[in-house]
Amino acid sequence: MTTPPSLPRHARVVIVGGGVIGTSTAYHLALMGWQDIVLLERHQLTAGTTWHAAGLMVTYGSTSETSTEIRKYTRDLYGRLEAETGQATGFMPIGFIEVASDKDRLEEFRRVAAFNRYCGIDVQEISPRQVQELFPLAKVDDIEAGFYVKEDGRVNPVDVTMALGKGARMRGVKILEGVPATGVLQKSGRVTGVRTPYGDIQTDFVVNCAGLWARELGAMSGVAISNQAAEHYYLITEAIKDLPPNMPVLEDPSAYGYYRQEGGGLMVGLFEPVCAPWKIDGTPTDTPYLDLEPDWERMGPYLETAMSRVPVTSQVGMKKFFCGPESFTPDLKPIVGEAPELRGYFVAAGLNSIGILTGGGLGRVMAHWIINGLPDVDVTGMNIDRVLPFQANPEYRRSRTVESLGMVYKCH
């Protein structure tokens, strides 16, 4: 193969993966002053899971100080990126409401709200009547309360990624699309380069942001990464007559659903309690923008339950019932940091469907870690050093993934 003129022979850092995490890491490395950064993307930016993300930008919900800070930073970053880069992010601070539909959820959400307030998130507990005033289409006669964050909302995931990519390019990052990483070179337990079909790039640091493909890329270098793809669903309705403008995002874990406006109708997103792992034996690398055949029989009861919270969704036509692969980990925490098996090999993957709402902050954390040798926040709970080799075996991934997606909406 002829080496493209644009393929450098050396880079200070090579990032593999052009989704929101990869572009954010590139952006923050450049923002902190590092030059000679290269990002490799096998297909096109966003072609893995970022393109089909729902785009929720929510700071409420975590009881981790680190995770809450990362979410808050991400929301603030998305709010200012357009002014910096000229590329829209689609950020709309329309608000977010978490619905407590029983006493147990009420107790849990009050505890979460108190912790989030401590972390600087303005969370208000509101009555069922106030929930309906903000989201008139919701059925509220069986709920206890709502928890409202006015500054939260939604973004366009593709636009966010393009804005981060543009911001990175403006600071000198070289983004190469259509260039896969086929291996990582090493010597004496340390990264020395990245192999591509067009030649090798010498480097001291590799960042695996390959999303769905992170496990396979890690395995090439003996790095254990225990993420696994699973089916993930949302429905988009036909246009709804007299749909109130700028309703907040609504979420009801007891109904397995979240709801936001989409193209004149509503999106109904799902986190079912028992999910379906996808491609246990390996994720296909030759197909970008994966759009899977929905399992109507399995998902029908969950969809029915979710639609009951917003009854109009079952009274209008259905534009699309989308199923796409999303990456989950056994403990529902991201896998980030320097791999214990190989010095200079960093990982940021396994985002468990929160890649958009943590992407900005996680890219910052990775940049600090690479540049300074330490992250700028406590990442103990998500550090890759907790991953054991057996957790990457197929049966373990299958059995744990069946449960892990359902943990998102489980009452804790």
Regions found by a protein language model. Name each.
Residues 223-224, 239-344:
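Active-site lid/adjacent beta-loop-alpha segment flanking the redox-cofactor pocket in flavoenzymes
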Residues 69, 99-107, 147-166, 176, ...:
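Short beta-strand to alpha-helix junction loop
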Residues 199-246, 377:
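Central helical "cap/lid" subdomain
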